[in-house]
Amino acid sequence: MNEYLKSQSIAITGANSYVGLNFIKFCLDKKIKVKAFCRNPGSFSDDLKKNSYFEGFPYTLSSKSELKLKNVDSIIHLANQRVNSSRIGFNIDPNLEGAKHLIAQCKIHDIKNIIFLSSHLAYKETLSQYGKSKFACEKFFIDNGHTVVRSGIVFGGEALGFYKNLLFALKSNKFFPIICANAPIYPIHIEDLMNIMLMLSKFTHNTKKLYCLGEKHSIKLNFFLSRLAYKFYNKKIIFISLPGKIIYILTNALGYF
């Protein structure tokens, strides 16, 4: 790792997430200073709190308070809030509002580079509310001169959050209900994702603002899950396909109320 990265300071939002905690430890191992922002910085382990390269700060997407970004070179923006309200009463996307506030704070502290972690579910015709929110944030960050990383399903590293729950479900069940079993996905190992985000974090001017990461050729969702079950638990999973279109129609209709 070159001398620039050793002296680099990175801020991470959503820092107590699966990707966030793995990324923090990844940076600290390389002697990169980390300012970690999350809802509850008290939840960080004692080992992290004692590390001289680490600082934790409270943060929510809805907060408009000043962020402790002094001497930060770049920001890895992982924070995301699921929209739980009905679509009838949905007026403001907290993720987009958080993006606006973060960019405003960057201008105050003269930070040139935000790397926003998005998803392959983010595209114009997406049916997912999660994907729609990510897509709107993508456009806002790119329009303001920052970088978007559109990632496939992330796996590997220390199992936390959704990935941990997924592995537990595979371990605990022989029969596994699944929607869109044959859906094409482009998984990426978390170490590869972290290496690329770290590389992008040292750039102040990028010629390309959107990076799509994952396997070059798609694999089916049920194949990916079956390989995880075999790798970690040496077991075969029997998948029970659920009617994806019917479930989508029902949940989409119920989501208005």
Stretches found by the model and what they are:
Residues 9-30:
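N-terminal Rossmann NAD(P)H-binding glycine-rich loop of SDR-like oxidoreductase domains
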Residues 13, 37, 75-79, 114-120, ...:
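SDR active-site strand-loop-helix element
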Residues 37-42, 61:
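N-terminal Rossmann-fold cofactor-binding loop
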Residues 57-97, 105, 120-124:
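NAD(P)H-binding glycine-rich loop region in Rossmannoid oxidoreductase-like domains
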Residues 94-133, 147:
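Conserved Rossmann-fold NAD(P)-dependent oxidoreductase catalytic core, especially the SDR/UDP-sugar
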Residues 139-157:
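Conserved beta-loop-beta element that borders a ligand/cofactor-binding pocket
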Residues 160-164, 179-201, 208-212:
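Substrate-positioning beta->alpha
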Residues 200-257:
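Mid/C-terminal beta-alpha module of Rossmann-like enzyme folds, strongest
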